[in-house]
């Protein structure tokens, strides 16, 4: 029996899971999950996610724990609906050295959250350093996105100008996000929301086909009807359009914390250390949120706590649920 089959069998007969799903129906519920040890949280949470649907953000204590949790959900759920939301910086936001892979994973997650249809589920695994960073708000993400579909009447010159305006760099062959190339009637472009670039074939001023392709072999992997090309949101979005990820995801999202108090203290520590290292401290609010701001943005959401150590004015008294 596979892990998913075991999960389905468990979900069908568990009274405790039924209680958990009933609590989930309360939009602003705060629930303390008692007596969960080892991998039990992953199992119960995956069952609740599959049964209840919606957007679920799991906040582990560090990057490694978040990655392990993601792997658990890969085995228990549809891995296409499980996303990793890491930090976009190699060291600290103060030094401005981006981690390209982290930026792509963050952008892909934001794109998935923004386009969540309301049916099914979406799981996000993250940790304090990533949650502390501000992101482009939904309006800015929409504004910066270049949408192209098969059959669109658009010239290569117009598309290229849009890519230049979005700070994409022209190269001979694309190999990393933020690049594009033009060869005859073909435009290759590497969006910050994808692990593979797109190849757009033009017939005159009409988009004839869109495909993903492998960088090394140059072979197409799949055909697409429509794509959304997203630039580096860290570079192109003004401070006034930056919000916490909790605000971006909205009050409908649910949050699962291994140790909420640790996460909030860590967010404040990151902000304080970054502030002391910054050459222009007045820019801190464009980079990082604060403990109090994050709490305020979480106040209308469902919160599930593995440890009942979050006694704060912004969050309701937790319901105790023994599993």
Please state what every model-predicted region is:
Residues 1-312, 316, 320-323:
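ASCE RecA-like P-loop NTPase motor cores
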């Amino acid at each position: 029996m596979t892990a998913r089959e075991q999960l389905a069998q468990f979900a069908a007969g568990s009274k405790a899971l039924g209680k958990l799903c009933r609590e989930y129906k309360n939009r602003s519920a705060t629930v303390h999950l008692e007596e969960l040890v080892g991998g039990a949280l992953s199992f119960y949470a995956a069952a609740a996610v599959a049964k209840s649907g919606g957007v679920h953000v799991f906040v582990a204590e560090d990057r490694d724990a978040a990655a392990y949790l993601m792997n658990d959900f890969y085995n228990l759920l549809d891995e296409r609906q499980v996303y990793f939301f890491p930090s976009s910086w190699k060291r600290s936001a103060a030094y401005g050295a981006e981690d390209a892979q982290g930026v792509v994973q963050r952008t892909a997650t934001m794109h998935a959250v923004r386009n969540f249809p309301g049916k099914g589920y979406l799981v996000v695994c993250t940790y304090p350093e990533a949650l502390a960073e501000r992101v482009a708000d939904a309006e800015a993400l929409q504004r910066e996105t270049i949408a192209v579909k098969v059959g669109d009447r658009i010239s290569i010159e117009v598309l290229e100008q849009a890519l230049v305006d979005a700070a994409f760099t022209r190269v001979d062959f694309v190999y990393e996000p933020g690049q594009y190339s033009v060869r005859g009637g073909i435009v290759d472009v590497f969006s910050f929301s994808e692990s593979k670039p797109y190849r757009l074939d033009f017939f005159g001023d009409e988009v004839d086909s869109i495909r993903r392709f492998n960088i090394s072999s140059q072979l197409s992997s799949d055909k697409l009807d429509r794509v959304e090309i997203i630039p580096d949101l860290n570079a192109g979005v003004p401070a006034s359009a930056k919000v916490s990820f909790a605000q971006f995801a909205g009050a409908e999202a649910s949050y699962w914390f291994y140790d909420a108090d640790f996460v909030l203290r860590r967010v404040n520590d990151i902000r304080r250390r970054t502030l002391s290292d910054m050459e222009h401290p007045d820019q801190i609010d464009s980079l990082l949120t604060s403990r109090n701001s994050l709490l305020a943005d979480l106040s209308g959401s469902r919160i599930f706590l593995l440890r009942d150590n979050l006694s704060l004015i912004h969050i309701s008294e937790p319901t105790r649920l023994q599993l």
